[in-house]
Amino acid sequence: MIGVDTNILVRYFTQDDAEQAKIVEQIIDTHATSAHSLFINNIVIVELIWVLERGYKYQKEEIAKLIKQILSTEEFAFENHKLLWLALAQYNQNNLDFSDALIGEINKEACCIETLTFDKSAIKARNFTLAQRKF
C-alpha cells in the first residue's frame, strides 16, 4: 500500500498542472491495480475539501459528489472509511464544514457522549453541544 498526499488528489481531479497530472495518472495506473492499494488518510480528505473550496471555488455539491466518488473507489483505502461516509452525510445535510462533521464522528466513535464547541454552525450537527457556563 502507498499513501498519497493532498496535492496528488488535487492534481488528479483539477488537472491544473498538466505535467504533474500525467505523473499522478501514471501512479494511479501503476499502483491502483488491486483493492486498497492507495491509502488516503482523514487529513488528506479534509485538506482536499479545503483546497477545492478555497483555492478552486468548487461548490459544496461538486465537492460532495467528488468525495463520494473517492470513497466509492475500491482501489483506495481509508483511515476511517465508515466515519468519512458519516461525515459526508453531515456535510450534505447541515451547514457545517466537513472537518467539523468528521470531528464529531471521530469523537462519537471514541465513545464521547458529546463534543463541546463554541461554533454555532457545528451545533446544528449531531454529536455537538454548545459549550456554556453552568451556574
PLM features: what roles do these ranges have?
Residues 75-118:
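Active-site neighborhoods of divalent-metal-dependent phosphate/nucleic-acid chemistry enzymes
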Residues 5, 47, 100, 119:
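Acidic active-site catalytic centers that drive phospho-/nucleotidyl reactions
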Residues 41-44, 83:
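Short, conserved alpha-helical segments within structured domains
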Residues 1-40, 55-60, 133-135:
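Short, well-structured N-terminal submotif of metal-dependent ribonuclease cores
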Residues 9, 45, 122-123:
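A generic structural signal for short hydrophobic patches within well-formed alpha-helices
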